[in-house]
A protein has these predicted regions:
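N-terminal Rossmann NAD(P)H-binding glycine-rich loop of SDR-like oxidoreductase domains
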Residues: 2-31
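Conserved Rossmann-fold NAD(P)-dependent oxidoreductase catalytic core, especially the SDR/UDP-sugar
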Residues: 10, 96-156, 170, 180
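Conserved beta-loop-beta element that borders a ligand/cofactor-binding pocket
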Residues: 155-183, 193
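Glycine/proline-rich active-site loop of Rossmann-fold NAD(P)-dependent oxidoreductases
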Residues: 179-193, 230-248
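A conserved pocket-lining segment of Rossmann-fold NAD(P)-dependent short-chain dehydrogenase/reductase
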Residues: 194-221, 226-230, 241-242
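Terminal hydrophobic/aromatic helix or amphipathic segment near a protein terminus
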Residues: 240-241, 248-307
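Amphipathic terminal alpha-helices
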Residues: 321-360
Length: 360
């Protein structure tokens, strides 16, 4: 594909999408004027701020506005979809737009979709560690996961469109995402802040059941770097990154048991004087939903184990510590973010910070 190119980014006001937008604005091809970015944004006020202060184009719409989403997708070379992995209608509309473009021009749209290893969970409820680790150098096990599972319907749509050939699709499957975001609005992740809020509310760190189940983690900046690795490969003539039936990309760098994470949260919050004890306790089954919300057995008590393969083959170089050190060391900053965002006077808009970071 010849430059310049046009990108449609969804989720720009969110944690992952906002960090992706910040990284796009730092790229040399963007600074050189070779990239046009259009963001799908819900809400006139947010859209206006992003357009005026960051200088990117916006389309104001909800993901449910299929006609608007379809048209926006039909006009771009690249779709980077981070907004919602469980909204197949919008994924379908984007693919329909890409198909219209292909039928008109013969050009494939590059489609990078942010899914998640929530699709690979079990129902352990913290009771055991499953030895199964999903791999991505052969995606047969991933493809075998039913499309009724979380994320899988949208993933399957993109895979089939990639096989058909009108998009060059990549389904990136991050595990728990940690770290501080760099976008214009939401800068906190989901799972660790939720566990911190629960610990503050219950005055003790908690885990689902015995907490023996195992998950993985990845820093948000390392995740975003994989998006751009795939993008650059797709834009190049070499195109080494597999797509089609092998379009799934895992990106785990950290491994932890839920009880280990809970113990680390308890230790660090107790050291700050935020909770009266460092000891973590198991939640009883009847306590889980009240403590952590719906689907908590899966989000905080399942096994979801994966190993990055193809990303490393392409030259992915995560910058944050692997094992569990990077993940555990992020807890202090996640705690600070939870406290900051809980204050009425806390800044909810980070566009000035983004501009300072960009030197503008």
């Amino acid at each position: 594909m010849s430059l310049p190119y046009h990108v449609l980014l969804t989720g720009a006001t969110g944690f992952v999408g906002g960090t992706t937008l910040a990284a796009f604005l730092e790229r040399e091809d963007y600074k050189a004027g070779r990239v046009k970015i259009t963001c799908l944004v819900r809400g006139e006020e947010r859209a206006k701020l992003i357009k005026e202060r960051l200088g990117v184009d916006v389309v104001v719409c909800d993901l449910a506005d299929a006609d608007v989403v379809r048209k926006a997708a039909s006009e771009v070379d690249v779709i980077l979809h981070t907004a919602n992995a469980d909204h197949p209608a919008s994924g379908r509309a984007m693919l329909e737009g890409a198909k219209q473009r292909f039928d008109k021009t013969g050009k494939q749209t590059i489609f990078i979709h942010s899914s998640g290893t929530g699709a690979l969970t079990d129902d352990a409820k913290g009771k055991f560690a499953d030895p199964k680790i999903y791999q991505d150098r052969d995606c047969a096990d991933i493809r075998a996961v039913p499309t009724t599972y979380v994320h899988r319907e949208t993933d399957d749509l993109i895979m089939k469109a990639s096989v058909e050939g009108y998009v060059r699709g990549y389904v990136v499957m991050p595990p728990l995402i940690y770290g501080r975001g760099r976008g214009p609005y939401s800068r906190t992740s989901v799972q660790i802040p939720a566990l911190i809020r629960a610990a503050l509310r219950l005055k003790q760190s908690i885990h689902v059941g015995p907490g023996l189940s195992i998950w993985n983690g990845v820093h948000v900046d390392d995740l975003v770097s994989l998006y751009f690795l795939l993008l650059d490969d797709a834009l190049s003539g070499a195109r080494k990154a597999p797509t089609g039936l092998e379009c799934f990309y895992l990106c785990a760098t950290d491994t932890y048991e839920w009880r280990e994470l809970a113990a680390e949260i308890g230790k660090r919050l107790h050291a700050k004087g935020a909770i009266p004890t460092a000891e973590a306790r198991p939640l009883k089954p009847e306590e889980v939903q009240d403590a952590l919300g719906a689907w908590s057995d899966f989000a905080y008590g399942s096994n979801s184990r994966s190993a990055a393969g193809k990303a490393y083959d392409l030259g992915w170089k995560p910058k944050h510590p692997t094992g569990s050190n990077g993940l555990f060391d992020s807890i202090d900053k996640e705690y600070d973010a939870v406290i900051e965002e809980g204050k009425d006077e806390a800044p909810k808009v980070h566009i000035d910070e983004m501009n300072r970071a960009l030197g503008s």
